[in-house]
Amino acid sequence: MYRVNVSLFIKAQEYQLLDNFLRTTLVPQLRGDEGVAQVDLLEVMAQAPVVEIAQPMDDMVLALLISLEQERDLEYYLSEVLCERLELLGKTFGERVLYHVTPMRQIAL
């Protein structure tokens, strides 16, 4: 299993607008993309000491976790599909929502 984490950095006051955009536009598109097995949205907890040091208290960090079954899906997804999806995010929110993409591979335990 391969995953792509898209960390979304927002001001707390932007949360409702972003949440609506994610639920009505971006997540349905991601779920419909070929090779995508699952899409999850998580909030990075503000209580974590590392997060508090890295950001002011009025900021939020969300993690959009996209699961892909195969490595070939990951490579294509990163280079072709996800760029287009994130371009829409950028056009909609500009610098009010910043993001960082981290591709990951699951390690069997």
Predicted segments — roles?
Residues 25, 39, 63-67, 102-107:
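A general secondary-structure boundary signal
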Residues 2-9, 42-80:
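Short, well-ordered beta-strand segments in beta-rich or mixed alpha/beta enzyme
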Residues 9, 15, 68-71, 87, ...:
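Generic detection of intrinsically disordered/low-complexity segments and helix-coil linkers/edges
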Residues 14-44, 81-91:
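Short amphipathic alpha-helical segments
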Residues 26, 70, 74, 82-85, ...:
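Terminal low-complexity, poorly structured segments
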Residues 40-57, 86-109:
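Glycine-rich beta-strand-turn "strand-cap" elements at beta-sheet edges
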